Amino acid sequence: MFMINLLLTIVPILLAVAFLTLVERKVLGYMQLRKGPNVVGPYGLLQPIADAVKLFTKEPLRPLTSSITMFIIAPILALTLALTMWTPLPMPHPLINMNLGVLFMLAMSSLAVYSILWSGWASNSKYALIGALRAVAQTISYEVTLAIILLSVLLLSGSFALPALITTQEHMWLIIPSWPLAMMWFISTLAETNRAPFDLTEGESELVSGFNVEYAGGPFALFFLAEYANIIMMNIFTTILFLGAFHNPLMPELYTINFALKATLLTISFLWVRASYPRFRYDQLMHLLWKNFLPLTLALCMWHVTMPIITAGIPPQT
């Protein structure tokens, strides 16, 4: 039964990822006043299938100088971790109900750094290595703020379990009292998933595509799938944390529709940001985090710790 549940989770994720690539190309197309893909199938709807067939039927070339084992393991690890992170997400019922779901998510996103590092190192190409080092530095840096923002939200929720956040937000979304945290969280998720304007790992002008420069065909497609699965997962996580949908046990479908709609809108906002903003310079990226976000999130975390203690002495206002 568990295997069926697992498949019923993984297959829709991969389908969502496939069509997200199409949505991205369409959104970017219309924002640049052009059509986007519209040849394969009606309105270009079969484009992702054509892309998948093309990528997976190509010969996976391996450079002679590369470390073969690590070169092949890296993309598989990237996709495995990207899919594993979906297990504790309540939609409205998680695949595995974990007591420490949030901690599990953080641990998995930290492990994702290794797949990037290995892919850059195993390629034995200077561009791939520079891209991987940039990606690792960026991902590790932004995880610091993500962890602190999560801690602040969990202080309001009072539990590490993700379903508890649904209960916390029955009366009000957490984005309303803690909107500065939500804004910083959104920007940090952009940086964490290596999306524009923080896609310095893939700086075409200087790095020829970054850590996946030596990958072609299937392994490249695995990295691609992992990246987009992470984007959708991060937006779902944002929805759970700050835009909690109302859950009525008698009508769980309503929760799922509400939840999916919010996550979709957030994902489209990722694409909107990509179409609107130019790429950051690397020092600006690091400056934004260490000089601006980190002090602010620490201050807000202290605020979230002290507020319940201060207000605990006030008698209930009935």
UniProtKB/Swiss-Prot annotation:
<keyword id="KW-0999">Mitochondrion inner membrane</keyword>
<keyword id="KW-0679">Respiratory chain</keyword>
<keyword id="KW-0813">Transport</keyword>
<keyword id="KW-0830">Ubiquinone</keyword>
<dbReference type="GO" id="GO:0009060">
    <property type="term" value="P:aerobic respiration"/>
</dbReference>
<comment type="similarity">
    <text>Belongs to the complex I subunit 1 family.</text>
</comment>
<feature type="transmembrane region" description="Helical">
    <location>
        <begin position="294"/>
        <end position="314"/>
    </location>
</feature>
<dbReference type="Pfam" id="PF00146">
    <property type="entry name" value="NADHdh"/>
</dbReference>
<dbReference type="InterPro" id="IPR018086">
    <property type="entry name" value="NADH_UbQ_OxRdtase_su1_CS"/>
</dbReference>
<feature type="transmembrane region" description="Helical">
    <location>
        <begin position="100"/>
        <end position="120"/>
    </location>
</feature>
<feature type="transmembrane region" description="Helical">
    <location>
        <begin position="146"/>
        <end position="166"/>
    </location>
</feature>
<comment type="function">
    <text>Core subunit of the mitochondrial membrane respiratory chain NADH dehydrogenase (Complex I) that is believed to belong to the minimal assembly required for catalysis. Complex I functions in the transfer of electrons from NADH to the respiratory chain. The immediate electron acceptor for the enzyme is believed to be ubiquinone.</text>
</comment>
<feature type="transmembrane region" description="Helical">
    <location>
        <begin position="253"/>
        <end position="273"/>
    </location>
</feature>
<dbReference type="GO" id="GO:0008137">
    <property type="term" value="F:NADH dehydrogenase (ubiquinone) activity"/>
</dbReference>
<keyword id="KW-0249">Electron transport</keyword>
<keyword id="KW-0496">Mitochondrion</keyword>
<keyword id="KW-1278">Translocase</keyword>
<keyword id="KW-0812">Transmembrane</keyword>
<feature type="transmembrane region" description="Helical">
    <location>
        <begin position="2"/>
        <end position="22"/>
    </location>
</feature>
<dbReference type="InterPro" id="IPR001694">
    <property type="entry name" value="NADH_UbQ_OxRdtase_su1/FPO"/>
</dbReference>
<feature type="transmembrane region" description="Helical">
    <location>
        <begin position="222"/>
        <end position="242"/>
    </location>
</feature>
<protein>
    <recommendedName>
        <fullName>NADH-ubiquinone oxidoreductase chain 1</fullName>
        <ecNumber>7.1.1.2</ecNumber>
    </recommendedName>
</protein>
<keyword id="KW-0472">Membrane</keyword>
<feature type="transmembrane region" description="Helical">
    <location>
        <begin position="68"/>
        <end position="88"/>
    </location>
</feature>
<keyword id="KW-0520">NAD</keyword>
<keyword id="KW-1133">Transmembrane helix</keyword>
<dbReference type="GO" id="GO:0005743">
    <property type="term" value="C:mitochondrial inner membrane"/>
</dbReference>
<feature type="transmembrane region" description="Helical">
    <location>
        <begin position="171"/>
        <end position="191"/>
    </location>
</feature>
